[in-house]
Amino acid sequence: MGETVDESMLFLNQDNHVLVDKAVAEALENKAECILCMDDAICSRVLKNLRERHVKIPEDVRVASFYNSTVLENNIPSITSLKFDAKELGMVACKTLLDLTEGQEVKERTLLPYEVVLKESTK
């Protein structure tokens, strides 16, 4: 809050390893302090790329994921993530879509509970 975001450092729709690798290279060139991944599959690829480049986590760059699945639970260092109820998120999204298709007014924003699980990758 209050921080400005450098939009040139936002890499959206990086859904294959070539795009992820390119985004990691660009983030490192631009001296990114942290790489925040949209899911654990992307985060796994980011971690592999960083290891191949001998980049130390969190000393050289911090890494976090928006999803707290079992995919990364054995990673060293442990990965900071968001913990939330994916089932509840899906139900709310589904209800919102149904309401929209029925012409009902929907909230612009729905906030659901979450927890930031701080681990070694961002210390």
Regions found by a protein language model. Give the residues of each.
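Bacterial carbohydrate/catabolite-sensing allosteric modules
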Residues: M1-K123
